[in-house]
Amino acid sequence: MLTLNYYVEISATPQRVWEVLTDVELYKRWAQAFSPQSQFEGAWEEGGGITFFDPDMGGTRAIIDTVLPLQKLEFHHVAIFNPDNRQQLDADLASRWIGSREIYQIDTNNDRLLLNVTIHTHNDFVSMFNHGWAKALPLIKAISEEQA
């Protein structure tokens, strides 16, 4: 697995950035950087499951490892599925995807807030993450700063 790092400085409170990351409707606004109808179902609770999907494209299921409100979210992917909601646990693509990990860290220092995103993934997904996060981080920043 490779480690990818992305970050953006945001002029907003940790509460606002946390809300942008975890609220269903706000998530849809920035996650469109990855797919047009990207959304999630589930609760941000340690040990719980969450599903990220686009109804037209399928998605992924993840288990939440860490929830430190206003500070850190961490989860790892355990399955991918087709638009018809059938899991692909044995497919070649699934074997490369399962185990991928995402970590979202909100760091504050004086008046600075930095959102750090760390991804551990297979080489096949580097381009997807690079392109997606290049679009998603400015959206997260803009949405967070709307009501800062």
Name every feature range the model reports, one short phrase each.
Residues 3-10:
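Short amphipathic
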Residues 95-98, 120-148:
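A conserved amphipathic terminal alpha-helix motif
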Residues 49-55, 75-77, 117-119:
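Short beta-strand segments that buttress and anchor functional surface loops
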Residues 22-25, 138:
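Solvent-exposed alpha-helix faces
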Residues 38-41, 57-110:
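Hydrophobic-ligand binding "helix-grip"
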Residues 5, 25-61:
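Short beta-edge strand/loop motif at the mouth of beta-sheet-based domains
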Residues 1, 49, 70-72, 110-114:
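A generic structural signal for beta-strand entry/edge sites
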